[in-house]
């Protein structure tokens, strides 16, 4: 089944679920997308798919009614990052992200680049610490803080720069909501329904646990994309979240 929409970003879902599209072939990605309902989730397009298929893939998803999180994690000099973020806004994406480790001037430039878009601007989110990273990984980079401590420091900088929220692990969510307030959005990868394999994520939670922790948007990949019945899997996840709420 194929759903269509009259605008590039129609925000027709209240679900916090964002499905990560990780496909090597465009046709397979769209075949999967045509099995699910834009009322049940949003979609995330990352570096590999965007490099392979470009902006047209985003348009194809939008034409099917889906809001798109463009997960390119921009990290460059302020002017270059600002132009990239503005280009994403021109594309009509729902959310775009940058690396908080790019610093305050870079994040402020990205924020200012979205001002002309007004209410049509995408959510601007910063990545703190990748969920695959552990304390030993940070130590290798010369960071002596734990992942949780480093993520909180970067999240505070992100809020000070006026961004909409951060990507963080579910374990940080409770503390972040208390520290930064309900309006500061938390986007969390590593969310897997009970019984799913951990994959390459280290700090994981179930959707129900993530919701209880204060996560606003939860990124779920293979448990949905590799499901025999992805539409039903999404409905089951959303039903469990409504019960939790």
UniProtKB/Swiss-Prot annotation:
Active site: 73 (proton donor)
Pathway: Pyrimidine metabolism; UMP biosynthesis via de novo pathway; UMP from orotate: step 2/2
Residues binding substrate, per UniProt: 22, 44, 71-80, 131, 192, 201, 221-222
GO terms of biological process kind: 'de novo' pyrimidine nucleobase biosynthetic process; 'de novo' UMP biosynthetic process
Entries under NCBIfam families matching the protein: PRK00230.1 (NF001273), pyrF (TIGR01740)
Annotated family: Belongs to the OMP decarboxylase family. Type 1 subfamily.
PANTHER family cross-referenced by the UniProt entry: OROTIDINE 5'-PHOSPHATE DECARBOXYLASE
Entry protein name: Orotidine 5'-phosphate decarboxylase
């Amino acid at each position: 089944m194929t759903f269509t929409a009259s605008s590039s970003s129609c925000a027709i879902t209240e679900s916090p679920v964002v499905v990560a599209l990780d496909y090597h072939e465009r046709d397979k990605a769209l075949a999967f997308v045509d099995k699910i309902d834009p009322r049940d989730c949003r979609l995330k397009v990352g570096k590999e798919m965007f490099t392979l298929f470009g902006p047209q893939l985003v348009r194809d998803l939008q034409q099917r009614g889906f809001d798109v999180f463009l997960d390119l994690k921009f990290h460059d000099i302020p002017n270059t990052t600002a132009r990239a973020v503005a280009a994403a806004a021109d594309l009509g994406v729902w959310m775009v992200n940058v690396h908080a480790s790019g610093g305050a001037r870079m994040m402020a430039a990205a924020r200012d680049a979205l001002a002309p878009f007004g209410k049509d601007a995408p959510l601007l989110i910063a990545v703190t610490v990748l969920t695959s990273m552990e304390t030993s990984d940070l130590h290798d980079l010369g960071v002596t803080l734990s992942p949780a401590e480093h993520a909180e420091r970067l999240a505070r900088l992100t809020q000070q720069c006026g961004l909409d929220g951060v990507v963080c692990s579910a374990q940080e969510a409770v503390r972040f909501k208390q520290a930064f307030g309900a309006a500061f959005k938390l986007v969390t990868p590593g969310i897997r329904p009970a019984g799913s394999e951990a994959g390459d994520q280290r700090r994981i939670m179930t959707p129900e646990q993530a919701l209880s922790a204060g996560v606003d948007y939860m990124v779920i990949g293979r448990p949905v994309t590799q499901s025999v019945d992805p539409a039903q899997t999404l409905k089951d996840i959303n039903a469990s979240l409504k019960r939790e709420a």
